[in-house]
């Protein structure tokens, strides 16, 4: 993953909002190398070079990531990092955390890759301390940044793209905006996706293999976004965003031999509005405030004669109101202090008679410090979290309060070399989701939060540009994670399962990443990106249990990805691959639940024509070129060989 270089001595939390000049060392290195915590960024300009075709593909290119993908365009895609589970991964969109208090998981398939200017992953605490407290309330974070309006350019800026592919896939996309005067700008984006997802798959039948075709798997997604930016002066910025997403998809269900029939469907609607204002109050103080309201609706239907009236119709509505304020102080060069206060309210309503309509008040306060001097950077954070749940129907209020610390250091042993050593620790706890607490015959209101401790030690290196190599970044990180009060499902009786705090999990491993670019001839280069992860995530609940010291479900020991691109003036070519070793779908690691490892390869070719200040790009992709047959989630087969082609015009 490649991002724009920043000066090793810069402080990104303060440089953008203060005029104070910070001490700068002569060595330059990207953020991935100088950060006190593992950080990986993929910028939009790197997507073509890496052969990335979707947001799940982008996530696959980051070390330590386990993606749960149910297959097909628009299929549910959630992220687990370093064996902690998707509920421990926070996802923010343009600076505001995305929330799903019902399940605790964010479906990344909702977000269009075309609308992303960059996507970053931070494991532990972000080095930027001028952020909402909620951003620090997750073990790891995925940060998505969309395109910003272009300030000061009054001409109409237009980008239009059309993508078509196998299995009936078609997706138009448009981005249009312009400046209003010298200090205002607007931007509108929209996209639509349709796919039949009727791909073939193989299913074993004794000693034979039977070929089937996915049915009841079509999807229609639509998304629009409106952005407005105003800069009243050189030190203040107001951003306003409205987001709307609408999706209808049929659900094929698990693949079962001789039973490919399904009548399930899911309707999703999500909309939110947010506004943020950032300003410099004085030479040493800066302020950032943000407000957001989010509304989402899910409707699940299953038409089957076993239900009264022949149909199961479950409807859920979630609402969230969120406000945050952050104050940054830079009293002297190299020292930054910040305080953040966040409040958010969540509730959940459904048409289920037994549902008790819970709501939650959350208050987070973060006190942060960062110090940088030439070869040394240190960060520290204390996060106070207060949660109050009101289950409803006369149930007693549930309260949890906890103070969690984190700290990190990065130092450069030799000032003439971009070689860094980093150490960091983060303690955090996760509140149970509404499903885990209140779901009928499943949840338990007596659950305690999960407590997580993360330790990381890493080495990073950036080679200064040479005649034979223009860029080389290498990172190696080892880690140890421990989770107490792990929330697991256990059988209450023969028919009913319930949630309880029985689990303890320990995870340890090594993450490696490498990015390199080699100039070949004039206007030609070879660009290489790769990552590898070795991970053991083990159940440590009880020695007399069958799952003692067994690998967690869907957690491979080995995983990795790579891409090699030949950039040239004619037709640029990319080869890429990702894969993982075998996994198990159950905690007991029974042989019958083993999922085979896989390695998927793909190829891409693209060229950009430039004329009269405009651009026209043509691109073709061969996906899963060698037709690998595999499952990421048990009984949800992934597509085999497929293709896509796109044309993009920029005015």
Each predicted region: which residue ranges?
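A beta-strand signature from Gram-negative outer-membrane beta-barrel systems
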Residues: 113-159
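Membrane-embedded beta-barrel scaffold of Gram-negative outer-membrane proteins
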Residues: 284-302, 421-424, 450-508, 513-517
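Gram-negative outer-membrane beta-barrel transporters
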Residues: 333, 338, 375-378, 473-482, ...
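N-terminal periplasmic "start-of-domain" segments of outer-membrane beta-barrel proteins
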Residues: 21-49
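Flexible loop and strand-edge segments within Gram-negative outer membrane beta-barrel domains
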Residues: 199-201, 211-221, 229-287, 293-320, ...
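Surface-exposed extracellular loop regions of Gram-negative outer-membrane beta-barrel proteins
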Residues: 248, 388-393, 397-403, 409-456, ...
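Extracytoplasmic beta-strand/coil segments of soluble accessory domains associated
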Residues: 56, 60-97
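C-terminal beta-signal and adjacent terminal beta-strands/loops
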Residues: 579-586, 594-596, 605-651
């Amino acid at each position: 993953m490649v991002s724009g270089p920043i000066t090793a001595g810069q402080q990104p939390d303060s440089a953008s909002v203060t005029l104070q000049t910070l001490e700068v060392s002569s060595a330059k290195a990207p953020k991935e190398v100088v950060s006190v915590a593992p950080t990986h960024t993929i910028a939009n300009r790197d997507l073509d070079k890496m052969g990335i075709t979707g947001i799940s593909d982008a996530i696959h290119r980051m070390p330590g990531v386990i993606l749960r993908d149910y297959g097909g365009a628009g299929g549910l895609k959630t992220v687990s990092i370093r064996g902690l589970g998707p509920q421990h991964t926070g996802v923010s969109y343009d600076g505001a955390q995305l929330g799903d208090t019902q399940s605790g998981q964010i479906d990344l398939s909702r977000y269009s890759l075309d609308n992303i200017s960059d996507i970053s992953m931070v494991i532990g605490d972000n080095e930027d301390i001028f952020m909402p407290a909620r951003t620090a309330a997750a073990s790891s974070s995925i940060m998505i940044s969309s395109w910003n309006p272009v300030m000061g350019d009054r001409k109409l800026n237009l980008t239009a793209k059309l993508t078509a592919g196998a299995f009936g896939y078609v997706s138009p996309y448009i981005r249009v905006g312009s400046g209003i005067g010298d200090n205002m700008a607007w931007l509108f984006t929209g996209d639509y996706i349709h796919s039949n997802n009727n791909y073939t798959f193989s299913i074993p039948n004794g000693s034979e293999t039977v070929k089937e075709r996915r049915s009841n798997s079509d999807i229609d997604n639509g998304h629009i976004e409106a952005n407005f930016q105003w800069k009243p002066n050189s030190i203040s910025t107001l951003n306003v965003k409205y987001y709307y997403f609408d999706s209808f998809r049929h659900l094929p269900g698990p693949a079962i031999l001789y039973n490919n029939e399904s009548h399930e469907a899911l309707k999703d609607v999500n909309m939110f509005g947010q506004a943020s204002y950032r300003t410099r109050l004085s030479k040493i103080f800066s302020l950032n405030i943000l407000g957001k309201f989010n509304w989402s609706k899910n409707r699940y239907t299953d038409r089957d004669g076993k239900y009264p009236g022949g149909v199961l119709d479950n409807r859920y509505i979630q609402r969230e109101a969120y406000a945050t304020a952050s104050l940054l102080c830079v009293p002297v060069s190299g020292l930054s202090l910040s305080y953040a206060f966040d409040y958010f309210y969540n509730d959940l309503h459904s048409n289920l008679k037994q549902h008790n309509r819970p709501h939650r008040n959350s208050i987070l306060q973060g006190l942060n410090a960062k110090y940088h001097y030439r070869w040394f950077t240190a960060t520290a954070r204390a996060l106070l979290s207060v949660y109050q749940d009101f289950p409803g129907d006369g149930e007693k209020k549930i309260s949890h309060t906890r103070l969690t610390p984190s700290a990190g250091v990065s130092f450069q042993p030799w000032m003439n070399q971009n070689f860094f050593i980093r150490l960091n620790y983060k303690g955090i706890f996760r509140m149970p989701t509404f499903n885990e607490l209140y779901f009928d015959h499943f949840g338990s209101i007596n659950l305690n939060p999960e407590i997580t401790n993360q330790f990381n030690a890493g080495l990073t290196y950036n080679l200064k540009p040479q005649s034979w190599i223009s860029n080389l970044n290498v990172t190696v990180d080892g880690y140890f994670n421990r989770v107490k009060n792990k929330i697991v499902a256990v059988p209450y009786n023969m028919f009913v399962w319930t949630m309880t705090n029985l689990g303890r999990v320990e995870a340890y491993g090594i993450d490696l990443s490498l990015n390199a670019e080699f100039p070949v001839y004039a206007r030609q280069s070879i660009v290489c990106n790769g990552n590898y992860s070795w991970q053991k995530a083990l159940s440590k609940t009880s020695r007399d249990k069958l799952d003692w010291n067994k690998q967690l479900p869907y957690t491979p020991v080995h995983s990795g990805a790579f891409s090699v691109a030949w950039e040239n003036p004619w037709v640029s070519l990319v080869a890429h691959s990702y894969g993982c070793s075998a996994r198990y779908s159950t905690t007991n690691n029974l042989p019958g639940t083993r999922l085979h490892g896989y390695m998927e390869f793909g190829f891409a070719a693209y060229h950009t024509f430039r004329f009269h200040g405009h651009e026209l790009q043509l691109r073709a992709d061969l996906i899963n070129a060698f037709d690998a047959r595999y499952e990421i989630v048990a009984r949800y087969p992934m597509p085999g060989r497929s293709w896509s082609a796109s044309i993009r015009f920029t005015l």
